[in-house]
């Protein structure tokens, strides 16, 4: 539908917690006429087509989360090598080493799950939807946690806008909501898991 079609109106730009690089507005359609040449698929199939697009959208959001988490991890690793406390780099302290190890391990695991879901979708696997839901749920939870842990490693500096961590945390938080909340992802996964033989098929 052309954006300037008669009957389309746009609400105010929302003032969001994060993701301020792209505007968010309400779009209202009132008696909008759409040329038959603009029809995608068959009349009445719009909802079904939109639902098919969700799997790819979920993989996309999962990938966004991986990118933010990787940036946060890189920033935290550099900070641990540079920041000195009690006469040595904070990276020498075992507690922070454990935190960094878990961040990296979880991020690698999330990346592999997202890749697997993308392959399933490309191959039109009948279980692609559940793999996409699992990847979206896992990667966005991991992504937010990695960003949050990276902020914690920076201490008070992580909370200051001079450093990028507070933005990574704000931006990654919405990934757990977009393209279906992670609670909805759990419902999709659980409902499939409760069907006969599901735990043998989905591995």
Residue ranges with predicted function:
Residues 77-91, 104-138, 151-154:
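C-terminal helix-coil-helix/basic helical segment that borders enzyme active sites and/or dimer interfaces
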Residues 13-16, 39-54, 79-93, 117, ...:
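Conserved catalytic-core motifs characterized by acidic clusters
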Residues 1-74, 78, 88, 181-203:
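FAD-binding core of flavoproteins
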Residues 19, 126-203:
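Alpha-helix capping/hinge segments and adjacent helical runs
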Residues 66, 70-73, 107-114, 143-147:
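Hydrophobic faces of stable alpha-helices that mediate helix-helix packing
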